[in-house]
A protein has these predicted regions:
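Flavin-dependent oxidoreductase catalytic cores
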Residues: 1-181
Length: 181
C-alpha cells in the first residue's frame, strides 16, 4: 500500500485508516508504515495486523523533508541504534512477517547499509529492500548497486535482499541481477 503514518493510525485519522481497507482481489498485499516513536510503531503494528495483510513493511527510505524532519523515513538513518530498536519492537508486536525498505545511508559519509542489513536481520525482519542512493541524493545521480551486491553476497545474510533504483527496463533488471546477485 501507499505508506501510512503510524501517528495517523493510532489517532484513528480517517485518511490513514482508509488505507487499511483491503479488497480480496488486491491480495497478496503488504501494508507499509512509517514513524519514529517506539510506542506508536508498536501500536500501529497491532492495528495493521487486524487488517490481515500478508506483510507489514516499515519505510525507512522516504527522503521527503516533512517525513525526515520527524526522524521517520530516511531520517532514521541518522540513528541506526534507534532504527534497530524500533524494528525489534515492531517485529515483537505482530505475528505478521515484517520487511523493511531503506537507503544506503544518510549521506556518502554514513553509508552503513551493510551493518544495517545484518542488524535488522538479527532482530527478525524477513526481507530488506534497499534503494541505491543516500537520503542526501534524494532521487538524483546514479543509484549505486555495489553495496547492494555486497549484501546479497554476504554469507551471513539469509533473508531476501531487493535492490531498487535506476531499473528502467526488463533488460537492465536482468543485467543487474546477474551482476549483483
Amino acid at each position: 500500500t501507499e505508506f501510512i503514518s503510524v501517528e495517523g493510525l493510532i489517532r484513528d485519522a480517517d485518511k490513514s485508516v482508509q488505507k487499511l481497507d483491503i479488497y480480496e482481489e488486491e491480495r497478496p498485499i503488504g501494508i507499509q508504515i512509517f514513524g519514529a516513536e517506539l510506542d506508536s510503531m508498536m501500536r500501529a503494528a497491532e492495528i495493521v495486523e487486524e487488517a490481515k495483510p500478508e506483510v507489514l513493511d516499515i519505510n525507512y527510505g522516504c527522503p521527503v523533508k516533512k517525513v525526515v524532519c520527524k526522524m521517520a523515513g530516511a531520517g532514521i538513518l541518522q540513528d541506526i541504534d534507534r532504527m534497530v530498536k524500533l524494528t525489534d519492537a515492531v517485529v515483537k508486536s505482530t505475528n505478521l512477517p515484517v520487511t523493511v525498505k531503506t537507503r544506503l545511508g544518510w549521506d556518502e559519509k554514513t553509508m552503513y547499509i551493510e551493518e544495517i542489513a545484518e542488524r535488522l536481520q538479527d532482530v527478525g525482519i524477513k526481507a530488506l529492500s534497499i534503494h541505491g542512493r543516500t537520503r542526501k541524493q534524494m532521487y538524483k545521480g546514479e543509484a549505486d548497486w555495489t553495496l547492494i551486491g555486497n549484501i546479497k553476497n554476504n554469507p551471513r545474510i539469509h533473508i531476501p535482499i531487493f535492490g531498487n533504483g535506476d531499473i528502467d527496463s526488463p533488460q537492465k533488471a536482468l543485467e543487474y541481477r546477474n551482476r549483483y546477485g
